Curated annotation (Swiss-Prot):
The lineage of its organism: Eukaryota, Fungi, Dikarya, Ascomycota, Pezizomycotina. FAD-dependent monooxygenase; part of the gene cluster that mediates the biosynthesis of the polyenes aspernidgulenes. The carbon backbone of aspernidgulenes is synthesized by the HR-PKS sdgA, which accepts acetyl-CoA as the starter unit and performs malonyl-CoA extensions as well as regioselective methylation and reduction. The resulting nonaketide offloads the HR-PKS by intramolecular lactonization to yield the 5,6-dihydro-alpha-pyrone-containing hexaenoic acids preaspernidgulene A1 and A2. The FAD-dependent monooxygenase sdgC then installs the first epoxide on the penultimate double bond. One of its GO terms (biological process) is secondary metabolite biosynthetic process. This is FAD-dependent monooxygenase sdgC. It comes from the Eukaryota. Its EC number is 1.-.-.-. Keywords: FAD, Flavoprotein, Glycoprotein, Membrane, Monooxygenase, Oxidoreductase, Signal, Transmembrane, Transmembrane helix. Glycans are attached at N236. It holds the Pfam family FAD_binding_3. The gene is sdgC. Belongs to the paxM FAD-dependent monooxygenase family.
Protein backbone atom coordinates (compact mmCIF):
# COMPACT_ATOMS: atom_id res chain seq x y z
CA UNK A 1 0.00 0.00 0.00
CA UNK A 2 1.13 3.58 -0.68
CA UNK A 3 1.72 4.96 2.80
CA UNK A 4 0.25 8.32 1.81
CA UNK A 5 -3.02 6.59 0.89
CA UNK A 6 -3.25 5.31 4.47
CA UNK A 7 -4.54 8.10 6.71
CA UNK A 8 -4.60 8.30 10.50
CA UNK A 9 -6.87 10.69 12.39
CA UNK A 10 -5.33 11.66 15.73
CA UNK A 11 -7.80 12.98 18.30
CA UNK A 12 -6.08 15.44 20.63
CA UNK A 13 -3.18 17.85 20.18
CA UNK A 14 -1.64 16.73 23.46
CA UNK A 15 1.96 15.70 24.09
CA UNK A 16 1.00 12.22 22.93
CA UNK A 17 -0.91 13.48 19.90
CA UNK A 18 1.85 15.78 18.67
CA UNK A 19 4.51 13.12 19.26
CA UNK A 20 2.43 10.73 17.17
CA UNK A 21 2.09 13.40 14.46
CA UNK A 22 5.87 13.76 14.22
CA UNK A 23 6.30 9.98 14.20
CA UNK A 24 3.73 9.44 11.44
CA UNK A 25 5.33 12.17 9.34
CA UNK A 26 8.72 10.47 9.60
CA UNK A 27 7.06 7.18 8.60
CA UNK A 28 5.57 8.80 5.50
CA UNK A 29 2.01 8.22 6.73
CA UNK A 30 -0.70 10.80 6.08
CA UNK A 31 -2.47 12.17 9.16
CA UNK A 32 -4.44 15.00 10.70
CA UNK A 33 -4.73 16.01 14.35
CA UNK A 34 -8.10 17.20 15.68
CA UNK A 35 -7.60 19.57 18.62
CA UNK A 36 -10.62 20.86 20.54
CA UNK A 37 -8.99 24.14 21.62
CA UNK A 38 -8.95 27.06 19.18
CA UNK A 39 -5.29 27.70 20.01
CA UNK A 40 -2.92 24.75 19.55
CA UNK A 41 -0.62 26.36 22.12
CA UNK A 42 -3.34 26.92 24.72
CA UNK A 43 -1.85 27.20 28.21
CA UNK A 44 -2.99 24.07 30.03
CA UNK A 45 -1.15 22.30 32.83
CA UNK A 46 1.94 22.94 34.92
CA UNK A 47 5.37 21.34 34.91
CA UNK A 48 6.45 18.07 33.34
CA UNK A 49 9.63 16.08 33.69
CA UNK A 50 11.56 14.52 30.83
CA UNK A 51 13.30 11.23 31.57
CA UNK A 52 15.75 9.37 29.31
CA UNK A 53 13.02 7.25 27.69
CA UNK A 54 11.16 10.38 26.61
CA UNK A 55 14.34 12.23 25.62
CA UNK A 56 15.51 9.44 23.31
CA UNK A 57 12.32 9.49 21.23
CA UNK A 58 12.30 13.28 21.06
CA UNK A 59 15.93 13.05 19.92
CA UNK A 60 14.80 10.71 17.12
CA UNK A 61 12.24 13.34 16.12
CA UNK A 62 14.99 15.94 15.78
CA UNK A 63 13.85 18.00 18.76
CA UNK A 64 16.66 17.47 21.26
CA UNK A 65 18.46 20.76 20.63
CA UNK A 66 15.29 22.84 20.88
CA UNK A 67 14.27 21.14 24.12
CA UNK A 68 17.68 21.58 25.68
CA UNK A 69 17.18 25.34 25.29
CA UNK A 70 14.03 25.12 27.43
CA UNK A 71 14.53 22.25 29.88
CA UNK A 72 16.34 22.57 33.21
CA UNK A 73 18.54 19.54 34.05
CA UNK A 74 18.16 18.25 37.60
CA UNK A 75 21.40 17.47 39.40
CA UNK A 76 20.25 16.60 42.90
CA UNK A 77 17.01 15.49 44.56
CA UNK A 78 16.13 16.32 48.17
CA UNK A 79 13.58 14.47 50.29
CA UNK A 80 12.44 16.10 53.52
CA UNK A 81 10.53 14.50 56.38
CA UNK A 82 8.33 15.73 59.25
CA UNK A 83 11.09 15.14 61.83
CA UNK A 84 13.41 17.54 60.01
CA UNK A 85 15.57 14.87 58.40
CA UNK A 86 16.75 15.69 54.87
CA UNK A 87 18.16 13.17 52.41
CA UNK A 88 19.89 14.32 49.22
CA UNK A 89 20.72 12.08 46.26
CA UNK A 90 22.75 13.03 43.18
CA UNK A 91 21.45 10.14 41.10
CA UNK A 92 19.78 12.55 38.60
CA UNK A 93 23.25 13.72 37.55
CA UNK A 94 24.62 10.16 37.60
CA UNK A 95 21.95 9.02 35.14
CA UNK A 96 23.50 11.24 32.46
CA UNK A 97 27.11 11.75 33.43
CA UNK A 98 30.00 9.36 32.94
CA UNK A 99 31.48 9.54 36.43
CA UNK A 100 29.64 7.16 38.74
CA UNK A 101 31.50 6.01 41.86
CA UNK A 102 31.90 2.37 42.83
CA UNK A 103 29.22 1.55 45.38
CA UNK A 104 28.63 -1.50 47.53
CA UNK A 105 24.95 -2.20 47.00
CA UNK A 106 23.60 -3.95 50.12
CA UNK A 107 21.14 -6.29 48.38
CA UNK A 108 23.35 -7.53 45.58
CA UNK A 109 24.53 -6.47 42.15
CA UNK A 110 25.12 -2.78 41.59
CA UNK A 111 27.04 -1.99 38.37
CA UNK A 112 28.92 1.26 38.70
CA UNK A 113 29.82 2.53 35.25
CA UNK A 114 27.43 1.12 32.69
CA UNK A 115 24.03 2.57 33.51
CA UNK A 116 24.14 6.13 32.22
CA UNK A 117 21.80 7.04 29.40
CA UNK A 118 23.29 10.28 28.09
CA UNK A 119 20.13 12.28 28.74
CA UNK A 120 19.44 14.45 31.75
CA UNK A 121 16.44 14.27 34.03
CA UNK A 122 14.95 17.63 33.15
CA UNK A 123 12.06 19.90 34.06
CA UNK A 124 10.10 22.27 31.83
CA UNK A 125 6.53 23.48 31.59
CA UNK A 126 3.96 21.55 29.61
CA UNK A 127 3.50 24.72 27.56
CA UNK A 128 7.18 24.71 26.57
CA UNK A 129 7.07 21.05 25.53
CA UNK A 130 3.89 21.56 23.49
CA UNK A 131 5.45 24.59 21.75
CA UNK A 132 8.57 22.67 20.76
CA UNK A 133 6.47 19.78 19.44
CA UNK A 134 4.06 22.03 17.53
CA UNK A 135 6.60 24.47 16.09
CA UNK A 136 8.79 21.57 15.01
CA UNK A 137 6.10 20.10 12.74
CA UNK A 138 6.84 20.33 9.03
CA UNK A 139 3.20 20.90 8.06
CA UNK A 140 1.19 22.71 10.72
CA UNK A 141 -1.90 22.76 8.48
CA UNK A 142 -2.46 19.17 9.55
CA UNK A 143 -3.34 20.40 13.05
CA UNK A 144 -7.05 21.22 12.88
CA UNK A 145 -8.03 23.45 15.82
CA UNK A 146 -11.49 24.06 17.23
CA UNK A 147 -12.42 20.48 16.33
CA UNK A 148 -14.17 18.93 19.33
CA UNK A 149 -14.98 15.33 18.41
CA UNK A 150 -18.51 14.15 19.16
CA UNK A 151 -18.86 10.92 17.17
CA UNK A 152 -16.75 8.22 15.49
CA UNK A 153 -18.36 5.88 12.97
CA UNK A 154 -17.00 2.84 11.15
CA UNK A 155 -17.92 2.59 7.47
CA UNK A 156 -20.21 -0.35 6.81
CA UNK A 157 -19.63 -0.99 3.11
CA UNK A 158 -16.15 0.39 2.60
CA UNK A 159 -12.83 0.56 4.34
CA UNK A 160 -12.29 3.35 6.83
CA UNK A 161 -13.81 5.44 9.58
CA UNK A 162 -15.42 8.89 9.89
CA UNK A 163 -14.89 11.34 12.73
CA UNK A 164 -17.54 14.02 13.29
CA UNK A 165 -16.90 17.26 15.17
CA UNK A 166 -19.08 19.70 17.07
CA UNK A 167 -18.61 22.27 14.29
CA UNK A 168 -20.36 19.92 11.84
CA UNK A 169 -17.31 18.69 9.96
CA UNK A 170 -16.64 15.09 8.93
CA UNK A 171 -13.07 13.77 8.67
CA UNK A 172 -12.47 10.46 6.90
CA UNK A 173 -9.47 8.21 7.46
CA UNK A 174 -8.36 4.62 7.78
CA UNK A 175 -7.80 4.57 11.54
CA UNK A 176 -8.46 6.78 14.57
CA UNK A 177 -5.90 7.14 17.36
CA UNK A 178 -7.12 8.72 20.58
CA UNK A 179 -4.67 11.01 22.38
CA UNK A 180 -7.37 12.90 24.23
CA UNK A 181 -6.69 12.01 27.85
CA UNK A 182 -8.28 9.82 30.47
CA UNK A 183 -11.85 11.05 29.94
CA UNK A 184 -11.58 10.39 26.23
CA UNK A 185 -14.37 10.80 23.68
CA UNK A 186 -12.45 8.32 21.53
CA UNK A 187 -12.61 5.72 24.28
CA UNK A 188 -16.27 6.46 24.97
CA UNK A 189 -17.12 5.95 21.29
CA UNK A 190 -15.17 2.70 21.24
CA UNK A 191 -17.06 1.44 24.28
CA UNK A 192 -20.34 2.44 22.65
CA UNK A 193 -19.54 0.47 19.50
CA UNK A 194 -18.44 -2.57 21.47
CA UNK A 195 -21.91 -2.58 23.03
CA UNK A 196 -22.79 -5.83 24.78
CA UNK A 197 -19.31 -7.24 24.10
CA UNK A 198 -17.96 -4.95 26.82
CA UNK A 199 -19.03 -4.19 30.36
CA UNK A 200 -18.34 -0.47 30.02
CA UNK A 201 -19.09 0.24 33.66
CA UNK A 202 -16.55 -2.37 34.74
CA UNK A 203 -13.98 -0.80 32.41
CA UNK A 204 -14.70 2.66 33.84
CA UNK A 205 -14.12 1.29 37.33
CA UNK A 206 -10.52 0.53 36.34
CA UNK A 207 -9.87 4.16 37.29
CA UNK A 208 -9.96 4.78 41.03
CA UNK A 209 -8.94 7.98 42.79
CA UNK A 210 -7.56 8.05 46.32
CA UNK A 211 -5.67 11.36 46.06
CA UNK A 212 -6.36 14.90 44.89
CA UNK A 213 -3.89 17.48 43.66
CA UNK A 214 -3.51 21.24 43.47
CA UNK A 215 -0.75 22.33 41.10
CA UNK A 216 0.71 25.55 39.79
CA UNK A 217 3.86 27.49 38.98
CA UNK A 218 5.32 29.80 41.61
CA UNK A 219 7.65 32.75 41.15
CA UNK A 220 11.25 32.05 42.25
CA UNK A 221 11.96 31.36 45.92
CA UNK A 222 15.29 31.48 47.70
CA UNK A 223 16.08 27.98 48.90
CA UNK A 224 14.71 26.11 45.85
CA UNK A 225 17.22 26.87 43.08
CA UNK A 226 17.21 25.54 39.50
CA UNK A 227 18.83 22.13 39.19
CA UNK A 228 17.36 20.83 42.42
CA UNK A 229 14.21 18.80 43.02
CA UNK A 230 12.33 18.86 46.32
CA UNK A 231 9.94 16.23 47.68
CA UNK A 232 8.46 17.09 51.08
CA UNK A 233 6.90 13.98 52.63
CA UNK A 234 4.16 14.42 55.22
CA UNK A 235 1.45 12.17 56.63
CA UNK A 236 -1.22 11.79 53.91
CA UNK A 237 0.23 14.72 51.96
CA UNK A 238 3.19 15.45 49.71
CA UNK A 239 4.58 18.63 48.18
CA UNK A 240 6.73 18.31 45.06
CA UNK A 241 8.68 21.27 43.69
CA UNK A 242 10.61 21.43 40.40
CA UNK A 243 12.36 24.74 39.53
CA UNK A 244 12.77 25.53 35.84
CA UNK A 245 15.58 27.35 34.05
CA UNK A 246 14.05 30.73 34.88
CA UNK A 247 13.84 29.67 38.56
CA UNK A 248 10.02 29.61 38.47
CA UNK A 249 8.88 26.58 40.43
CA UNK A 250 6.42 24.00 39.16
CA UNK A 251 4.80 22.43 42.19
CA UNK A 252 2.07 20.03 43.22
CA UNK A 253 0.31 19.49 46.53
CA UNK A 254 -1.04 15.94 46.76
CA UNK A 255 -3.44 14.96 49.53
CA UNK A 256 -5.24 11.73 50.35
CA UNK A 257 -9.01 11.79 49.88
CA UNK A 258 -11.30 10.86 52.74
CA UNK A 259 -12.53 7.93 50.65
CA UNK A 260 -11.75 6.49 47.19
CA UNK A 261 -13.96 7.47 44.26
CA UNK A 262 -14.29 6.40 40.63
CA UNK A 263 -17.25 8.35 39.29
CA UNK A 264 -16.35 10.49 36.24
CA UNK A 265 -18.64 13.18 37.60
CA UNK A 266 -16.38 13.55 40.62
CA UNK A 267 -13.05 13.22 38.85
CA UNK A 268 -13.07 16.10 36.38
CA UNK A 269 -13.19 18.97 38.82
CA UNK A 270 -11.47 22.34 38.61
CA UNK A 271 -13.12 23.49 41.82
CA UNK A 272 -11.30 26.62 42.98
CA UNK A 273 -12.94 26.45 46.38
CA UNK A 274 -11.61 22.93 46.93
CA UNK A 275 -8.13 24.08 45.92
CA UNK A 276 -8.29 26.93 48.42
CA UNK A 277 -9.37 24.57 51.19
CA UNK A 278 -6.52 22.18 50.38
CA UNK A 279 -3.98 25.00 50.27
CA UNK A 280 -5.17 26.45 53.57
CA UNK A 281 -4.95 23.08 55.31
CA UNK A 282 -1.41 22.56 53.97
CA UNK A 283 -0.09 26.08 54.59
CA UNK A 284 2.11 24.99 57.49
CA UNK A 285 3.67 21.95 55.80
CA UNK A 286 7.44 22.26 55.78
CA UNK A 287 9.30 22.15 52.47
CA UNK A 288 12.89 22.77 53.49
CA UNK A 289 14.72 25.02 55.91
CA UNK A 290 12.73 28.23 56.50
CA UNK A 291 10.21 27.45 53.72
CA UNK A 292 6.66 26.17 54.02
CA UNK A 293 3.97 25.38 51.45
CA UNK A 294 2.42 28.78 52.18
CA UNK A 295 5.47 30.41 50.58
CA UNK A 296 4.81 28.60 47.31
CA UNK A 297 1.09 29.28 47.43
CA UNK A 298 1.24 33.06 47.93
CA UNK A 299 3.68 33.37 45.03
CA UNK A 300 1.51 31.40 42.58
CA UNK A 301 -0.75 33.55 40.37
CA UNK A 302 -2.60 30.66 38.71
CA UNK A 303 -3.36 27.16 39.93
CA UNK A 304 -5.54 24.16 39.11
CA UNK A 305 -7.19 21.32 40.98
CA UNK A 306 -7.78 17.76 39.92
CA UNK A 307 -8.44 14.30 41.24
CA UNK A 308 -5.53 11.92 40.60
CA UNK A 309 -6.90 8.76 39.06
CA UNK A 310 -4.97 5.52 39.02
CA UNK A 311 -5.65 2.53 36.82
CA UNK A 312 -5.00 0.78 33.54
CA UNK A 313 -7.76 0.21 30.99
CA UNK A 314 -7.92 -3.30 29.57
CA UNK A 315 -9.54 -2.55 26.18
CA UNK A 316 -7.39 -0.35 23.93
CA UNK A 317 -8.78 -0.93 20.44
CA UNK A 318 -11.86 -1.95 18.48
CA UNK A 319 -11.99 -2.14 14.73
CA UNK A 320 -10.22 0.97 13.45
CA UNK A 321 -10.32 2.88 16.75
CA UNK A 322 -7.19 2.86 18.89
CA UNK A 323 -7.06 4.40 22.38
CA UNK A 324 -3.71 3.53 23.97
CA UNK A 325 -3.20 4.36 27.61
CA UNK A 326 -1.48 7.70 27.01
CA UNK A 327 -2.20 9.23 30.39
CA UNK A 328 0.61 8.08 32.66
CA UNK A 329 2.78 11.16 32.40
CA UNK A 330 4.65 12.81 29.58
CA UNK A 331 7.28 10.11 29.18
CA UNK A 332 4.93 7.16 28.87
CA UNK A 333 2.71 9.29 26.62
CA UNK A 334 5.72 9.80 24.34
CA UNK A 335 6.58 6.09 24.58
CA UNK A 336 3.05 5.06 23.71
CA UNK A 337 2.93 7.36 20.69
CA UNK A 338 6.22 6.00 19.33
CA UNK A 339 5.23 2.38 19.86
CA UNK A 340 1.87 2.98 18.18
CA UNK A 341 3.60 4.66 15.23
CA UNK A 342 5.75 1.54 14.80
CA UNK A 343 2.57 -0.54 14.56
CA UNK A 344 0.78 1.86 12.21
CA UNK A 345 3.78 1.82 9.90
CA UNK A 346 3.53 -1.98 9.69
CA UNK A 347 -0.18 -1.68 8.90
CA UNK A 348 0.52 0.89 6.18
CA UNK A 349 2.97 -1.48 4.50
CA UNK A 350 0.22 -4.07 3.93
CA UNK A 351 -1.59 -3.79 0.60
CA UNK A 352 -5.24 -3.12 1.49
CA UNK A 353 -5.03 -4.28 5.13
CA UNK A 354 -8.07 -6.25 6.26
CA UNK A 355 -9.86 -5.83 9.56
CA UNK A 356 -8.09 -8.99 10.73
CA UNK A 357 -4.70 -7.53 9.79
CA UNK A 358 -5.43 -4.35 11.72
CA UNK A 359 -6.79 -6.17 14.76
CA UNK A 360 -3.84 -8.56 14.88
CA UNK A 361 -1.23 -5.81 14.77
CA UNK A 362 -3.05 -3.52 17.19
CA UNK A 363 -3.53 -6.41 19.60
CA UNK A 364 0.20 -7.08 19.48
CA UNK A 365 0.87 -3.44 20.33
CA UNK A 366 -1.62 -3.60 23.20
CA UNK A 367 -0.06 -6.70 24.74
CA UNK A 368 3.45 -5.23 24.62
CA UNK A 369 2.51 -1.86 26.04
CA UNK A 370 0.19 -3.23 28.72
CA UNK A 371 2.99 -5.43 30.04
CA UNK A 372 5.23 -2.42 30.43
CA UNK A 373 2.56 -0.11 31.81
CA UNK A 374 1.48 -2.64 34.42
CA UNK A 375 4.93 -2.25 35.95
CA UNK A 376 4.76 1.56 35.69
CA UNK A 377 1.28 1.58 37.18
CA UNK A 378 2.37 -0.54 40.14
CA UNK A 379 5.30 1.79 40.74
CA UNK A 380 3.16 4.93 40.46
CA UNK A 381 0.80 3.64 43.14
CA UNK A 382 3.73 2.91 45.44
CA UNK A 383 5.30 6.31 44.75
CA UNK A 384 2.24 8.23 45.85
CA UNK A 385 1.79 6.19 49.02
CA UNK A 386 5.43 6.30 50.11
CA UNK A 387 5.52 10.06 49.58
CA UNK A 388 2.32 10.45 51.60
CA UNK A 389 3.62 8.11 54.33
CA UNK A 390 0.47 6.03 54.06
CA UNK A 391 0.71 3.34 56.71
CA UNK A 392 3.48 2.28 59.08
CA UNK A 393 5.43 0.13 56.62
CA UNK A 394 5.67 2.85 53.97
CA UNK A 395 6.71 5.38 56.61
CA UNK A 396 9.54 3.09 57.71
CA UNK A 397 10.67 2.32 54.16
CA UNK A 398 10.62 5.95 53.06
CA UNK A 399 12.34 7.32 56.16
CA UNK A 400 14.68 4.55 57.32
CA UNK A 401 15.36 2.24 54.36
CA UNK A 402 15.68 4.33 51.22
CA UNK A 403 18.10 6.97 52.59
CA UNK A 404 20.52 4.21 53.62
CA UNK A 405 20.67 2.27 50.32
CA UNK A 406 23.20 4.30 48.30
CA UNK A 407 23.07 3.73 44.57
CA UNK A 408 19.74 1.95 44.71
CA UNK A 409 17.91 4.65 42.75
CA UNK A 410 20.43 4.57 39.91
CA UNK A 411 20.29 0.80 39.55
CA UNK A 412 16.52 0.40 39.77
CA UNK A 413 15.83 3.45 37.63
CA UNK A 414 18.01 1.95 34.90
CA UNK A 415 16.03 -1.29 34.91
CA UNK A 416 12.79 0.63 34.49
CA UNK A 417 13.96 2.96 31.72
CA UNK A 418 16.29 0.77 29.65
CA UNK A 419 13.64 -1.52 28.04
CA UNK A 420 11.51 1.45 26.92
CA UNK A 421 10.40 1.37 23.27
CA UNK A 422 11.40 3.96 20.69
CA UNK A 423 10.84 4.42 16.94
CA UNK A 424 12.12 1.33 15.13
CA UNK A 425 12.32 2.97 11.68
CA UNK A 426 14.48 5.95 12.66
CA UNK A 427 18.18 5.68 13.60
CA UNK A 428 18.37 4.82 17.29
CA UNK A 429 20.67 7.06 19.34
CA UNK A 430 22.85 5.41 21.99
CA UNK A 431 24.24 8.45 23.85
CA UNK A 432 25.05 6.36 26.93
CA UNK A 433 26.05 2.75 27.68
CA UNK A 434 22.87 2.01 29.63
CA UNK A 435 20.85 1.51 26.44
CA UNK A 436 23.34 -0.96 24.96
CA UNK A 437 23.53 -2.92 28.19
CA UNK A 438 19.76 -3.31 28.18
CA UNK A 439 19.84 -4.91 24.73
CA UNK A 440 22.71 -7.24 25.61
CA UNK A 441 21.47 -8.39 29.00
CA UNK A 442 17.74 -8.38 28.30
CA UNK A 443 16.66 -6.26 31.25
CA UNK A 444 12.97 -6.36 32.00
CA UNK A 445 11.08 -3.52 33.68
CA UNK A 446 10.61 -5.42 36.93
CA UNK A 447 13.45 -7.96 37.03
CA UNK A 448 15.41 -7.78 40.25
CA UNK A 449 13.13 -5.17 41.77
CA UNK A 450 12.39 -6.11 45.35
CA UNK A 451 10.74 -4.25 48.19
CA UNK A 452 13.25 -1.43 47.80
CA UNK A 453 11.67 -0.40 44.51
CA UNK A 454 8.98 1.47 46.40
CA UNK A 455 11.16 4.14 48.02
CA UNK A 456 13.74 4.07 45.23
CA UNK A 457 11.29 5.01 42.52
CA UNK A 458 9.62 7.52 44.81
CA UNK A 459 12.30 10.00 43.84
CA UNK A 460 12.58 8.97 40.23
CA UNK A 461 8.95 8.95 39.24
CA UNK A 462 8.16 12.06 41.23
CA UNK A 463 8.67 13.73 37.86
CA UNK A 464 7.10 11.25 35.54
CA UNK A 465 4.06 9.62 37.06
CA UNK A 466 2.64 12.80 38.53
CA UNK A 467 2.96 15.23 35.64
CA UNK A 468 0.67 18.08 36.53
CA UNK A 469 -0.83 18.60 33.09
CA UNK A 470 -3.36 17.46 30.54
CA UNK A 471 -1.56 14.29 29.45
CA UNK A 472 -1.50 12.85 32.93
CA UNK A 473 -4.97 13.90 34.03
CA UNK A 474 -7.46 14.59 31.29
CA UNK A 475 -7.86 16.47 28.06
Amino acid sequence: MDKRSFKVIVVGGSIAGLTLAHSLDLAGIDYIVLEKHSDPLATVGGSVGLLPNGWRILHQLGLRHQLEQEACPVKVAHMTYPDGFVFSDNFPAAIQERQVPEIQFPIGYMPANDERFGYSLSVLTRQQLIEVLYLGLRDKSKIKVGQRVIKIQHHQNRRGVSVFTESGQEHVGDLVAGADGVHSITRSQMWLQLGQKLDAEKERRQLVAEYSCVFGISSPLKGIPPGEQLIACHDNATVLAFPGKDAHIGWGLIQKLNRPCNSPATTQSSDGETALIMAKSAAGLGLCKDLKFHDLWVNTPKYSFTILEEGLFQIWHHGRIMTPNMAQGANTAIEGAAALANTLRRISQIDKPSEDDINRLLQGYTVRQQKRLRAVHAISRSVTRVHARQGRIKKIIGRYVYPYTPGAALHTFSRIIAPAPCLDYVPMPFPGPGWTRALVSGWSPISGVLLLVIPIIALVYGYSVINFGRDSINN
